[in-house]
């Protein structure tokens, strides 16, 4: 039996690291649905978008870390269910993994658009390395880029895109960018810097639909009636917690997995971080 960690992002990898640091000698198995060893997500919205050379700088830990610390890692492993009675998690391919203790480190997924045209080709999200590589390719092919959302990730993407000569417009529903994370003064400084780089802004603006041509995006339509040319739309409108496993296992959830002061869920054999 082992401690099984579902999710190999920063939280999952560091959980494994600190278990070893604090002397845990039992088995540790990291389960990742991605095809590459665990990596840092923040760089994905920066230099990674415009340079393949940035890829070598983002692993969370060197591969030797997992071997040296006797941590098993299974890639391409999407967990689809938890059998709390048997203490087993099941992967999409049918493989099962028994646990003594289970740690859910499943993170969040990008919030999706639901407006007309949101399923057209050229509407992109940024969450994983695969997303970033796809976006990098599309940036090369696109002249006009619309970034939907004026948060940190959206503005970083806008800066990267304008830096390689793309015409970039940021659409933000709030009266200022980064409204939830910084003061108005700081937000104005960031906006001024990006405007100096060539980024355009539409504030207090709501996207109502996306128009396309031959199945690909070509225009954003705002509530005001204004239309903005777009070869590529990058959506950065927040994230939603991944609760499917916890809900299916009948764990207590409330805008996230409910835990106590030791990160235990309503099932004392399962933790969530």
Predicted regions and their residues:
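A conserved short coil-to-beta-strand element within the FAD-binding core of flavoproteins
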Residues: 76-87, 203-216
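Glycine-rich dinucleotide-binding loop and its adjacent helix/turn
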Residues: 106-164, 259-261
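Short hydrophobic core segments
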Residues: 6, 97-107, 228-238
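Beta1-alpha1 glycine-rich phosphate/pyrophosphate-binding loop at the start
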Residues: 1-72, 160-182
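FAD-site-proximal beta/loop scaffold in flavoenzymes
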Residues: 119-140, 214-221, 226-273
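Rossmann-like dinucleotide-binding cores of NAD(P)H-dependent redox enzymes
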Residues: 45, 58-59, 144, 153-209
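Redox-cofactor binding/interface segments in oxidoreductases and associated redox assembly factors
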Residues: 91, 104-105, 147, 222, ...
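Residue-level detector of alpha-helix initiation sites
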Residues: 9-13, 35, 108-110, 130, ...
């Amino acid at each position: 039996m082992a401690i099984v960690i579902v999710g190999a992002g920063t939280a999952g990898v560091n959980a494994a690291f600190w278990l070893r640091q604090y002397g845990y000698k039992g088995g540790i198995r990291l389960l990742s649905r991605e095809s590459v060893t665990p990596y840092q997500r923040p760089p994905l919205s920066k230099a990674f978008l415009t340079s393949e050379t940035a890829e070598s700088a983002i692993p969370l830990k060197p591969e030797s870390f997992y071997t040296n610390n006797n941590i098993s890692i299974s890639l391409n492993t999407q967990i689809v269910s938890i059998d709390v009675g048997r203490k087993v998690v099941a992967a999409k391919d049918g493989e099962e993994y028994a646990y003594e203790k289970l740690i859910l480190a499943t993170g969040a997924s990008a919030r999706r658009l639901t407006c007309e045209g949101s399923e057209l080709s050229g509407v992109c999200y940024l969450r994983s390395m695969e997303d970033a590589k796809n976006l990098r390719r599309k940036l090369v092919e696109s002249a006009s880029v619309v970034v939907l959302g004026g948060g940190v990730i959206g503005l970083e993407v806008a800066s990267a895109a304008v830096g390689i000569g793309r015409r970039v417009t940021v659409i933000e529903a709030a009266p200022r960018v980064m409204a939830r994370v910084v003061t108005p003064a700081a937000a104005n400084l960031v906006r001024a810097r990006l405007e100096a780089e060539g980024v355009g802004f539409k504030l207090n603006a709501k996207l109502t639909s996306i128009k396309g041509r031959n199945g690909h995006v070509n225009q954003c339509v705002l509530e005001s009636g204004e239309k903005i040319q777009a070869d590529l739309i990058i959506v950065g409108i927040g994230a939603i917690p991944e609760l499917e496993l916890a809900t299916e296992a009948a764990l207590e959830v409330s805008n996230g997995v409910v835990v106590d002061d030791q990160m235990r869920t309503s099932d004392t054999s399962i933790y969530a971080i």
